[in-house]
């Protein structure tokens, strides 16, 4: 189940693409855009990530940090980040614990097949660590700009 506006965002510590530990608490006093994607280097998620990359300075000017997260291992995330020149942390939750805490890991259905996976969801977390916005219907090409327009 997804988190709701006003909920406290669960803290986490996960490795990023470089194997460095990143915690939500590292960003206290800043808003955080936390976007989840099913798999690194796939077309839709690449477009979504490029949007955040291209608008990175605008997010920074609003005192906001961007974090991406999937269940990919750091080595795969690193290739993805390096190829796309992503300037923001891409987190790796291979155990799915944080993905579960945020309600984005669960049963999915596609073409008559059921499997466990990550839902495409983005949260905006306030400076105080509360869920400020929930995006569960994402348009990959315009998602970053849609968030900027909302804030």
Placement of each model-derived feature along the sequence:
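Chalcogenol-based redox active-site neighborhoods
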Residues: 1-151
């Amino acid at each position: 189940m997804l988190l709701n506006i006003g909920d406290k965002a669960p803290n986490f510590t996960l490795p990023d693409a470089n194997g460095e530990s990143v915690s939500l608490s590292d960003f206290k006093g800043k808003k955080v855009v936390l976007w989840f994607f099913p798999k690194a280097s796939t077309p839709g998620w690449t477009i979504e990530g490029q949007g955040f990359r291209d608008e990175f300075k605008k997010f920074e000017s609003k005192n906001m940090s961007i974090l991406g997260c999937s269940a990919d291992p750091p080595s795969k995330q690193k290739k993805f980040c390096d190829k796309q020149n992503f300037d923001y942390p891409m987190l790796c939750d291979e155990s799915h614990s944080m993905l579960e805490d945020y309600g984005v890991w669960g049963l999915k259905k596609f073409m008559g097949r059921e499997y466990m996976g990550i839902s495409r969801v983005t949260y905006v977390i306030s400076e105080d660590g509360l869920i400020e916005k929930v995006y569960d219907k994402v348009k990959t090409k315009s998602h970053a700009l849609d968030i900027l327009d909302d804030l």
